[in-house]
């Protein structure tokens, strides 16, 4: 629901701006100019584990874009947010936190950062190293990608301590890579 709303209202705002100020010069080169939205081109394997119906009126939005264009040629990409998370005291974008407290080093020094609203949300956080596999994470990224018009910076993580000789098997790496492809992850 969240990513549907984000993309929908960004497109709606960009189309309104195009109505006021004209479409961006590259609009004609976009998929949007051809009437193609991210919801039209996502990998349908997503529907096997997320059958959520669209909640917003995409047909009306498609017509609005057809009539007025877009002020922006692209609108969404998800990045790691490593630096900005320090400024805003947020987690690293869509990545699960490594721990409740993390230590981040930069040219300005060392920063100890506690996850937002630790006392209230402590039991709601899923920590990176407690996730048994990347499957659920890749499913979530695939669901997000259904609405994002660029790519998502997504990382798969492996705790070497869980594997023989502390070596992550190539078979597992390939499985996760193919799973990401299957779900339409564009990173």
Segments (PLM) and residue ranges:
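Extended, well-ordered alpha-helical scaffold/bundle regions in very large, multi-domain proteins
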Residues: 1-45
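Catalytic alpha/beta core of large soluble enzyme barrels
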Residues: 19, 23, 32, 40, ...
């Amino acid at each position: 629901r969240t990513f549907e709303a984000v993309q929908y209202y960004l497109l709606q705002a960009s189309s309104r701006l195009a109505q006021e100020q004209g479409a961006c010069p590259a609009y004609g080169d976009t998929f949007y100019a051809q009437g193609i939205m991210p919801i039209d081109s996502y990998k349908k394997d997503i529907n096997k584990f997320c059958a959520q119906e669209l909640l917003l009126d995409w047909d009306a939005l498609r017509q609005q874009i057809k009539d007025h264009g877009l002020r922006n040629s692209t609108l969404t990409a998800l990045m790691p947010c490593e630096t900005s998370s320090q400024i805003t005291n947020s987690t690293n974008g869509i990545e699960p936190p490594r721990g409740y407290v993390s230590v981040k080093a930069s040219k300005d020094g060392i920063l100890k950062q506690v996850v937002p609203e630790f006392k209230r949300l402590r039991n709601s956080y899923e920590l990176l190293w407690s996730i048994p596999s990347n499957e659920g994470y890749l499913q979530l990224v695939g669901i997000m990608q259904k609405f994002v018009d660029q790519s998502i910076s997504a990382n798969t993580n492996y705790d070497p301590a869980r594997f023989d000789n502390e070596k992550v098997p190539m078979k597992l790496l390939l499985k996760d890579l193919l799973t990401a492809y299957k779900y339409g992850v564009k990173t």
